[in-house]
């Protein structure tokens, strides 16, 4: 698939927006689950340091790069290996002066045969300016996830961001 066919959707509702991506991954659901919930695996493709208290009501604490956003939140749904939903509260940062107080990320994994997973990632309750900036960034992170799962060299995040930003509104 080409990058355009992998692009996500930006849904704007007033001052808020939702980003939605769907990827078909040639890996079992359990492998994908580990890649999105295990801090050592997240560090490989999501450019972050993560602490995840994996349970309903648990917490997440991420420092996500390359900007180094500090993000915390409560786990809303912990349903291995199907659903991981958590708040995404980002502290103010030079690139995000007001932070993000209400955002939520939902990862849904649906088995498609024995060794394929459909990943749907929904990033909701983002302020509109943040969503417009994050849309190509999340695309780039998901491209890195796919490369990581395949065992391929990971694409440079900044180069991927630049390559896909024309697919999204600005």
Segment roles from a protein language model:
Residues 1-4, 125-170:
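A conserved amphipathic terminal alpha-helix motif
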Residues 16-19, 92-147:
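Beta-strand/loop substructures that line and gate deep hydrophobic ligand-binding cavities in soluble
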Residues 20-21, 27, 31, 40-74, ...:
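Short beta-edge strand/loop motif at the mouth of beta-sheet-based domains
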Residues 35-36, 78:
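Conserved catalytic core of Hanks-type protein kinase domains
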Residues 64, 87-88, 121-123:
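Residue-level recognition of conserved beta-strand positions in structured domain cores
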């Amino acid at each position: 698939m080409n990058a355009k066919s992998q692009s996500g959707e930006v849904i704007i509702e007033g001052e808020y927006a939702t980003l939605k991506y769907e990827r078909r991954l040639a890996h079992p659901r359990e492998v994908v689950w580990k890649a999105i919930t295990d801090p050592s695996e997240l560090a490989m493709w999501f450019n972050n340091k993560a602490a995840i208290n994996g349970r309903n009501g648990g917490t997440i604490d991420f420092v996500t790069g390359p900007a180094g956003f500090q993000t915390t939140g409560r786990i809303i749904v912990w349903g291995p290996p199907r659903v991981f939903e958590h708040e995404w509260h980002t502290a103010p940062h030079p690139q995000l002066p007001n932070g993000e107080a209400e955002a939520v990320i939902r990862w849904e994994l649906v088995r498609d045969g024995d060794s394929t997973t459909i990943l749907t990632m929904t990033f909701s309750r983002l302020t509109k300016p943040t969503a417009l900036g994050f849309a190509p960034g999340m695309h780039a992170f998901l491209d890195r996830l796919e490369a990581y799962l395949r065992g391929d060299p990971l694409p440079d995040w900044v180069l991927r961001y630049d390559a896909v930003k024309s697919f999204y509104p600005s």
